[in-house]
Amino acid sequence: MIQPLVKASRPRLWVCSDCLLRRTLSPLLRQQRRRFTGFTAHAPKTLTGTIPVTHKNGDTKHDDSLLRSIFDSPETWKQFSGDKHGRNVGLFRNAYLTSPHGFLDFAHVSLGKARALVDKVLNAQSLDEYRAIVRHLDRLSDILCRVLDMADFVRVTHPDQQIQRTASMAWDMMYEYMNQLNTMTGLYDQLVQAMDNPQVSTTWSEEERMVAEVLKLDFAKSAVHLPKDARDKFVHLSSAISQTGTNFIQHMEPKIPYTTVEKSRMMGMDPVEVKRMASMGKVYVQTLSPQASIALRTVRDDHARHQLFMASRTASRRTVHTLEELMLLRGESAKLSGFESYGHLVLHDRMMASTPESVRQFLQALSENTRPQAQQEVADLTAAKRAHKGGDATLEPWDKDFYAESIRQAIKSRQKREDLSSYFSLGTVMQGLSRIFTRLYGIRFVPREPMPGETWHPDVRRLDVVSDVEGHVAVLYCDLFYRPLKSPNPAHFTLRCSRELSPHEIAETAHTQAENPHVLIPSFESAEFAANDGMAYSRSQDGAIKQLPTIALVCDFPQQSHNRPALLSFFQLETLFHEMGHAIHSILARTSFQNVSGTRCATDLAELPSTLMEYFAADPSVLALFARHYETDNPLPYEWVDNKIREARRFEALDTENQIILAMLDQELHSSKAVQGHIDSTEIFHSLQRQFSTAPPDPQGTAWQGFFGHLVGYGSTYYSYLFDRVLAQRVWNVVFNSGQGGAALQRENGERLKENLLKWGGSKDPWKCLAGALKDERLEGGGEKAMKLVGSWGGQRGTKSDQAV
């Protein structure tokens, strides 16, 4: 997701998979493939691991029609989803997960496999054993992540609290073991010894060498290379950082909890809402509330807006102190690990920027590019105020939202009120996404009947992703409808990454029951299924077995009814396209090693595919594929979309400028200033505003940075959102020719992006991937010059009618 740049606080080190050398199948394994007697199974024939390739037009048309119907028609879905009283196949078809306790069984079995791999790595002595170390460590990552990622998803998504609890217990068990591994010096020493031996490292593939570097960096971030005293201090600091970050988020508070305003000064705001907050002629507005934001956009009285603005931009002294304490702890931790600052530490690891100076070059170039349009927008706001107030009134900080809203409302009043959502039924949108991916990448969505126990709620649809060349390539679970207590936040979850399984790994499954006498191992119909825990896999023409990416998309769209399908707003359409961008990255980047599969690429590249999909959501040729009225079947008039985008992006340059300043603040707070033992976050923020803001800066006495919660989860990487937005615009303009002449749907353009960038995941230098996709040699080496170049491209999207080719 930054994913995106987003999305979940998952552990970084042991997160991904394993790819083993492709070897000739042993006679034992061939025998087991004929009938895997170790786990005689009576699974139904529908539990196949693969789907054959089909080129029949009839099948494609049927799948396309059915895809729309299962999302738009409750009756069709009820008939298609079938009988749920058969044999329970387990959640996600993981055969261990047929009951709440199954999570604990799955965790125990996985821990046994993990410990066996750790022993192999620690006891490696021969050249062959050292050559296998990267594969073993990557498989170790996959074993832990099979539990961690599924359990993490289930504990926040599953409606059954008992299953949530056991999933949390399984997660805790694996996370505790993962933390032990992260500081295990023996594993680090063995990896370094393998990397430093040319007789070992020269036999590795490029992908294998990339995984080795990733693992080494992750170990280094855990201070495993330091003396014991330093390691102990690092562990203590890490705990303090975690606790302080949690305190900052949970106890964030304004200096003034409520702002008291004379009721007579609240004209312009919804009178019903004002009355609800009023008492004895006063209005009491909670400082950090939606009502405060609405008031800043609608209340006409300058004095009232000034009061509300000052309160909403001023965090309490305690909150600011906690933030600064967090920055100092991070600085101390980075210094202990041998880095100049926390920013240097973070950017050293799987980031295209590599250094804080590169980030500054990008942000300053982007600021220069954005300034002319931002100045024009400030001039428009000032003109609106003067038209309202008369004379030579100047724009104040508390005026910006009010006059921006008045200009947007004026745009709306000149336009007919269009019902865009009637053209975006969820079924037609899913149908459209499948058609887009078919044209660009040769893959489509095929509805698959969920088996008993496979999904966590009856509303969840399973789609198999089928390639016209490779057959079944991924599994996609769609949990898209609203239900009580469900998280409203849209998200993409990778439940399992791509990974190639070795013949020896598959053969090992015959001993699973003997190695786990206290756990009842499920029955499987083959060794391949056993190695995949019952989940989907594919077999290539050369016989290689790969576990398939398994993905969940979660949204909060309105439920369909018997007489009307679920209809999406344009914002919801963009959201679904964005999340599907993450999914397509996971689907296309089916690498052999899990550590570099799918979205496990450079962190500041992860949001590029998802942000790019937002351009497709606004392209007329793309919308023509599916956007039709759910009752009349009339096509969507594109000018309605153009008007909607124009309204939404009216002050995009000022919004971008604000994001630039926040990204700069993130860099400054994580710079060497935090290593020196004192940091004044308020002065840093105000100084950046004075230097880079075209809009009026916050007045003295405010301290908005105390509300910047993203500093906890995105420390020193907040720039990534802007970076990927600029890159997405460039890819759209260069690779897809801004959609001109139907370029958004041309297969050669999709193949260009896939072959140069998407299919590699994190297995190739991202700058080389980007240079190949854009055919721009200036990017190949990366560094400060490349970052500055990207910043100079700018990031204002505009609308189709004013977009440059």
UniProtKB/Swiss-Prot annotation:
GO biological processes: peptide metabolic process; protein processing involved in protein targeting to mitochondrion
Cofactor note: Binds 1 zinc ion.
InterPro entries hit by this protein: M3A_MIP, MetalloPept_cat_dom_sf, Neurolysin/TOP_dom2, Pept_M3A_M3B, Pept_M3A_M3B_dom
Location(s), subcellular: Mitochondrion matrix
Binding site for Zn(2+): 578, 582, 585
Cofactors: Zn(2+)
Catalyzed chemical reaction(s): Release of an N-terminal octapeptide as second stage of processing of some proteins imported into the mitochondrion
Catalytic activity, EC: 3.4.24.59
Gene Ontology molecular function: any one: metal ion binding
UniProt keyword terms in alphabetical order: Hydrolase, Metal-binding, Metalloprotease, Mitochondrion, Protease, Transit peptide, Zinc
Presence of the UniProt keyword Zinc in the record: yes
Keyword Protease applies: yes
Targeting signal (transit peptide) range: 1-25
A Pfam entry, by short name: Peptidase_M3
Active-site residues annotated for this sequence: 579
GO cellular component: mitochondrial matrix; mitochondrion
Function noted in UniProt: Cleaves proteins, imported into the mitochondrion, to their mature size. While most mitochondrial precursor proteins are processed to the mature form in one step by mitochondrial processing peptidase (MPP), the sequential cleavage by MIP of an octapeptide after initial processing by MPP is a required step for a subgroup of nuclear-encoded precursor proteins destined for the matrix or the inner membrane.
Family according to the record: Belongs to the peptidase M3 family.
Protein's recorded name: Mitochondrial intermediate peptidase
